[in-house]
Amino acid sequence: MQIDQLDIQGRRIRYAVRRGSPARTPLLFLNGLGANIELAQPFIDALAEPTVVIFDVPGVGGSPTPAMPYRPSTIARLAARLLDHLGFDEVDVLGVSWGGVIAQQFALQHARRCRRLVLAATAPGLVMVPGRPSVLLKMLTPRRYVDPSHAHRVAGDIYGGMFRRESALVEKTLRHVRFSSRLGYYMQLAALVGWTSVPWLASVRQPTLIMTGIDDPMVPVINARFMRWLIPHARLEILDCGHLFLITLAEQSAHIVEAFLTEPQQQRQAAFSRPLSRRMQ
């Protein structure tokens, strides 16, 4: 990936572009809580063809911590300005976890620019079924990004899936971490306060792929089923993994995303034309 920096809306933003086929619609990748560009590298490498655009949100990775708090709409607008700078009009959008909130906001705020939408390990915000309180308490601190011993202790509880049994995954993931500041982390958390997409998800018209892990302690599967029911043109993929399946099952996840993004229009319509009574299955 080619990494650079750019001033957008008075903020210095670190971003990266992985160049791909000019025949494909570019993919905007919106990362999770405290997650810098490099953490998405395994998944991006597994994607065969599309150009991928990704950036560190303010206060994360190489993007300086902002002086003032922000909202999801702020980051969606920032992403649109970055795409303007790069000369990309229409894009596919993939958001994971916290980035899934931004992806939903982008699909609403910049609907004309969003061709297809992928929501991975995410929820509709305030109106969601949360994980256990003990898991959420561990998420309130970025300590796992800076304290390897703590990360080993809590990774299985937070991320589930393969992190419960493969300690080497923790070390492998930490090698990609570029932690910026605690304030930046808390600003990401604060941005979610009071936000929900439930009132308007039914107005999302983009073909949407919702992905979730069957063993996700942070975002239980019921949230993905709920979003599938709300979004008119949505399908659901449940993977045998935890919260970070884009990392632990990078090849499989990339294959599912690629198939969705390249699916012919007629085939997509057939897949999405299912009875309402089956939406919650």
Locate each region found by the language model.
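Flexible "cap/lid" loop of the alpha/beta hydrolase fold
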Residues: 104, 108, 114-144
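Conserved alpha/beta-hydrolase catalytic His-Asp/Glu region
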Residues: 128, 148-200
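Conserved HGGG/HGGXW glycine-rich cap/lid loop of the alpha/beta-hydrolase fold
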Residues: 11-62
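Conserved alpha/beta-hydrolase "acid-adjacent" motif
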Residues: 217-223
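Short beta-strand/loop motif that positions the catalytic acidic residue
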Residues: 204, 210-212, 216
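Catalytic histidine-centered segment of alpha/beta-hydrolase-like enzymes
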Residues: 241-254
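Gly/Ala-rich beta-loop-alpha elbow adjacent to hydrolase catalytic centers
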Residues: 95, 99, 103
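Active-site loop/oxyanion-hole signature of alpha/beta-hydrolase fold enzymes
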Residues: 54-94
